[in-house]
Amino acid sequence: MYLKDSILHKIQSYNDPFPHWELDSPLSGEMIGELQNVKISDAPRSFDGTRAADEGGDGIDGKLRVFLEKDNSNLLPYGMELIEDLKNKEVIDAVQEKIKKDLTNSYIRVEYIADRKGFWLKPHLDIPEKLMTMMLFINTYNESEKLGTDFYDLDMKLVKTIPYKHNSGYFFASGNNTWHGLEKKEIKIERRCMQINYVTFPTSWPING
């Protein structure tokens, strides 16, 4: 209910450098606890400027990622509440209207993330199969608000940084101008967040299932 309420009622729209929407209080206290406590491997990472380390890192980082799937859903009950919000017709209609994309027959992908010292993301575009990208932040370690996502214009000039505020988030549609990344910055302990996508490829969670 928290994510649904945030998308429907606690949302602000922006157009620079591309259309995006910021969310306030999208997570319940229980969901914050679940995201904070889920075990995410601290094995060495390549930190090649991609999340999966598929540009010179042999994809090693991708093998350490934690997605909400059927085989671990019983351990992540509050993540399942988010799935229900994301399947809600009011939510789907609201997101579709904003991003101007048809979500019919799409799937939901949810990832639990703990970015640690050395992590960064080069400016990139999402693959077209990602119809929408949403990031939800928790800042329980009082990290710098500058650790939010960086948005760029077509000249790769940094235009805006979404603040890394506790219990906040944003979303946007994939496109040919939605350049985003994370500059090399100091992460003192952890940058915990959750990435949510509506995608065209199959996952455990079809919106109609």
Could you tell me what each predicted segment is?
Residues 2-3, 8-98:
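Non-heme Fe(II)/2-oxoglutarate
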Residues 71, 75-78, 84, 91-209:
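Catalytic core of non-heme Fe(II) oxygenases with the double-stranded beta-helix
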